[in-house]
Amino acid sequence: IVIPRTMEDLDLQKVAGTWHSMAMAASDISLLDSETAPLRVYIQELRPTPQDNLEIVLRKWEDNRCVEKKVFAEKTELAAXFSINYVEENQIFLLDTDYDNYLFFCMENANAPQQSLMCQCLARTLEVNNEVIGKFNRALKTLPVHMQLLNPTQVEEQCLV
């Protein structure tokens, strides 16, 4: 899957801090369609390291409870792309952010034959911003695969530790 690169001038330190998963989309909806689906994760915090890597704190349902996990994303030659080892996903990239309100990112499994893509719209607050969700939907349309949208915006659906 060839992804348009939009964040070449990313300031990684500015994405640090608390985020909330507001919308999710995937090329294969089975990756998201149940609370225990493999990529149904709720981002809590992004922590850039001094080496420009990224520690991602997320929550996910496992064994009928919400657990916190950390995913280490290693920098690549592209400012907004990172290598990860999470489930079968092997790359994460930031599609767009204004640093203060929203951040769109995607996780990709580039290995054939199970190529897949999952993207999320993150927000700094739990307040739903329809303008940002609209922008996320437009960003999804630029991707080379059809994405199916899931809106986990009801707070009770969120996985809280």
From Swiss-Prot:
**Subcellular location, in the record's words?**
Secreted
Q: Which GO terms describe its molecular function?
A: retinol binding
| Claim: Disulfide bond is one of the keywords in the record | yes
Q: In which tissues is it expressed?
A: Synthesized in mammary gland and secreted in milk.
Q: Mention any Pfam family matching this sequence.
A: Lipocalin
Q: Which UniProt keywords apply?
A: Disulfide bond, Milk protein, Retinol-binding, Secreted, Transport
CDD domains given in the database record: lipocalin_beta-LG-like (cd19416)
| Domain of life, source organism | Eukaryota
Cystine connections: C66-C159, C106-C119
GO CC, one annotated term: extracellular region
What PANTHER family does this protein map onto?
GLYCODELIN, LIPOCALIN
Q: How does it assemble?
A: Monomer.
Q: What does this protein do?
A: Primary component of whey, it binds retinol and is probably involved in the transport of that molecule.
Task: Report the family membership.
Answer: Belongs to the calycin superfamily. Lipocalin family.
Which protein are we looking at? Beta-lactoglobulin-2
Q: Which organism is it from?
A: Canis lupus familiaris
